[in-house]
From Swiss-Prot:
Keyword terms, alphabetized: Hydrolase, Metal-binding, Multifunctional enzyme, Nucleotide-binding, Periplasm, Signal
Origin superkingdom: Bacteria
Disulphide-bonded residues: none
Organism in which the protein naturally occurs: Yersinia enterocolitica
A GO molecular-function descriptor: metal ion binding
Keyword Signal part of the UniProt annotation: yes
Name this protein carries in UniProt: 2',3'-cyclic-nucleotide 2'-phosphodiesterase/3'-nucleotidase
EC number: 3.1.3.6, 3.1.4.16
Taxonomic path: Bacteria, Pseudomonadati, Pseudomonadota, Gammaproteobacteria, Enterobacterales
Job description of the protein: This bifunctional enzyme catalyzes two consecutive reactions during ribonucleic acid degradation. Converts a 2',3'-cyclic nucleotide to a 3'-nucleotide and then the 3'-nucleotide to the corresponding nucleoside and phosphate.
One GO term describing the cellular component: outer membrane-bounded periplasmic space
Record: residues binding a divalent metal cation 1: 36, 38, 81, 264
Signal peptide per UniProt: 1-24
Length: 652
């Protein structure tokens, strides 16, 4: 009597096994990523008015095409910072988008079959209305889970998407793979674009948002979850609202891949080899495939999956990631041709941009190069500070609360080698006629001018924070020592404050880290700080012209909401252009000479010091250094990235 049930049970098991085996399949899936394109659609440097092989989506597109041809199944995503960042973006923002007009970035990207895009922090630079008009031109959807609409309390954008994606397995059979995409942006956008966003949106923590939504995506049937955070990679201990949250995302259960960006760096690469859990050879972070493909289209992110469903559901069995460059820095050769179709699509807007940046604004008496802007007072920063001070002094006339306060200005070198990843990224403005192209070269970002009210003590601490740019020099060592703290400090945080005089003693330890957090309360690098020839009064009150990013950040002493004196509606770049025009009308030309209000302090040592500084490798830079360097400098060759290395003598 037990024979029949046993036979039926065995038969059922065999049928189930046969069905499972018949349905079992292995699928290869490639996920491609672009990020931080910053409107660099063309392979063209509008600041120099010359073609380039080193960036531009028209070249990345060729890598995209090749990567797709190599794969049976592929999808393409973009990670934002798209509509701002090059003269093409400036051109479109200046003229505005008419109803139904498509932004050039989407004219190009709509031809490449993107599956989805994420919102970057720079998408908010021109306000929510302009962003909405721009996004309307995209033929692909957008996701972002942590930007919250104040009115509704819900995400402003679609938080995630699950896309039914047809794929072929290794036997050529068709399947449906449900790919989930979720996007995130840095919470700091509420500081950086405070004027555009306050009262309209809030931004939640990236990691906590992921923990909320990823289980929901799995519940809704996502076979694969691809996170697209506009956020960088840091292994610092977790902090709520961290700007760079990718490491913590890699520890969130349910995420299968991280396509990240924001930091303008390349992962996997040796730059991240020391991070615990980072497998540079495999391209994984805590076992999760992750990729960050640089900036401006100079790399394409590639994640390759092998998925298998022999257990009845799709599971990742293998995964690896890489970032493919469009240019070989070692051989100085292009690795990607121009995409002819994109060149055609962009032709009219490209010419419009060239015409836009060629508008004359004035005349300069001398060249303005930023080759030495990190180590001495410099004309490219000086002219910005001059413009900001002139604007502020004019603005406060007649104001009973502000008119009698002394005016200072803070500005930083925006183009001084990038993040030590671009030996060509320096300001190069020639004397003679100046155009808007030159103003954009001198002031890279569409920031607005904001004036803060700060004490003399704040000025000192502000400068101490800026001085974290330098490594501490050991005066008892004769070994080569690198002067610039490239790893932990961004040059756009190296504020020069004009209107005061001071020296920076790099033999002393830094008081603050690269994020302006106090690390040594006994350290002092700023020496001989004076105002009008006298030691600065810590109790005195000053107005400091700066930009919205710095003013609202609260990181530097003297910044934050409580210090705001007034917020101008004008962009710093427009202020600079107007200053150049006014000076030209008044004097026939603008004179961009550094006033040398700061310098590196002379170092005392019993032996010769070998201090190294990196800058442009061009012959133009070498000649400029020969003529303008305030310290003796000796060329020592080039480093592996291509920067010229100089030995700088701070003992004289």
């Amino acid at each position: 009597m037990f024979k029949r049930p046993l036979t039926l049970s065995l038969l059922a098991s065999l049928i189930a096994l046969t069905t499972s085996t018949a349905q079992a399949a292995t699928v290869d899936l490639r996920v491609l990523e672009t990020t931080d394109l910053h409107s660099n659609m063309m392979d063209f440097d509008y600041y120099k008015d010359k073609p380039t092989e080193k960036f531009g989506l028209v070249r990345t597109a060729s890598l995209i095409e090749a990567a797709r041809q190599q794969a049976t199944n592929s999808v393409l995503v973009d990670n934002g910072d798209l509509i701002q960042g090059s003269p093409l973006g400036d051109y479109m923002a200046a003229k505005g988008l008419k109803a139904g007009e498509i932004h050039p970035v989407y004219k190009a990207m709509n031809t490449l079959d993107y599956a989805v895009g994420n919102i970057g922090n720079h998408e908010f630079n021109y306000g929510l209305d302009y962003l909405k008009k721009s996004l309307a031109g995209a033929k692909f959807p957008y996701v972002n889970a942590n930007v919250i609409d104040v009115k509704t309390g819900k995400p402003l954008f679609q938080p995630y998407l699950i896309v039914d994606t047809p794929v072929k397995d290794r036997d050529g059979k068709n399947h449906n793979l449900r790919i989930g995409y979720i996007g995130f942006g840095p919470p700091q956008v509420m500081i950086w674009d405070k004027a555009n966003l306050t009262g309209k949106v809030t931004v939640d923590d990236i990691t906590e948002t992921a923990k909320k939504w990823v289980p929901e995506m799995r519940k809704q049937g996502a076979n694969l979850v691809v996170a697209i955070p506009h956020s960088g990679l840091s292994s610092d201990p977790y902090k709520t609202m961290a700007e760079n949250s990718v490491y913590y995302l890699s520890q969130v259960p349910g995420i299968d891949a991280i396509m990240f960006g924001h930091a303008h760096a390349v992962f996997p690469s040796k730059d991240f080899a020391t991070i615990k859990g980072a497998d540079i050879a495999q391209g994984t972070l805590n076992g999760i495939p992750a990729v960050m493909p640089g900036q401006w289209g100079d790399h394409l992110g590639v994640v390759d999956f092998v998925l298998n469903n022999d257990q009845g559901q799709w599971q990742v069995t293998q995964a690896k990631a890489e970032a493919r460059p469009i240019f070989d820095k070692a051989t100085q050769k292009s690795l990607a041709a121009e995409n002819a179709n994109l060149m055609k699509v962009l032709a009219a807007d490209h010419q419009g941009t060239r015409d836009f940046v060629s508008q004359p604004i004035g005349t300069a008496s001398d060249n303005m190069y930023s080759y030495l802007s990190l180590i001495q007072d410099d004309p490219t920063v000086q002219i910005v500070n001059n413009a900001q001070r002139a604007y502020t002094e004019h603005f406060i006339q007649g104001d009973p609360d502000l008119a009698d306060l002394p005016v200072l200005s803070a500005a930083a070198p925006f183009k001084a080698g990038g993040r030590k990843n671009d030996p060509a990224s320096f300001v190069e403005v020639e004397k003679g006629e100046l155009t808007f192209r030159n103003a954009a070269d001198l002031y890279l970002y569409p920031n607005t001018l904001v004036v803060v009210k700060a004490s003399g003590a704040d000025v000192k601490q502000w400068l101490e924070c800026s001085a974290a740019q330098f490594n501490q020099i050991d005066v008892n060592s004769s070994k080569p020592q690198s002067l610039i703290n490239w790893d932990s400090f961004r040059t756009y945080n190296f504020d020069v404050i004009d209107g005061v005089n001071y020296e920076i003693d790099v033999s002393q330890p830094a008081r603050y880290d690269g994020e302006c957090a106090l690390i040594n309360d006994k350290a002092e690098r700023i020496k001989n700080l004076t105002f009008n020839g006298k030691p600065i009064d810590p109790q005195a009150t000053f107005l400091i012209g700066t930009n919205n990013y710095r003013a609202y950040s609260g990181k530097f002493a003297g910044t934050g909401d409580s210090h705001i004196a007034f917020a101008s509606p004008d962009e710093n770049r427009a202020v600079l252009s107007a200053y150049i025009s006014a000076e030209t009308k008044k004097h026939g030309q603008v004179t961009p000479q550094a006033d040398n209000n700061w310098r590196l302090a002379t170092l005392n040592s019993q032996q010769p010091l070998d201090i190294r500084f990196e800058t442009s490798p061009s012959t133009k830079a070498a000649e400029f250094i020969k003529q303008k360097a305030q310290y003796p400098m000796k060329a020592m060759g080039t480093d592996e990235i291509g920067f010229a290395v100089f030995k700088i003598d701070l003992q004289k």
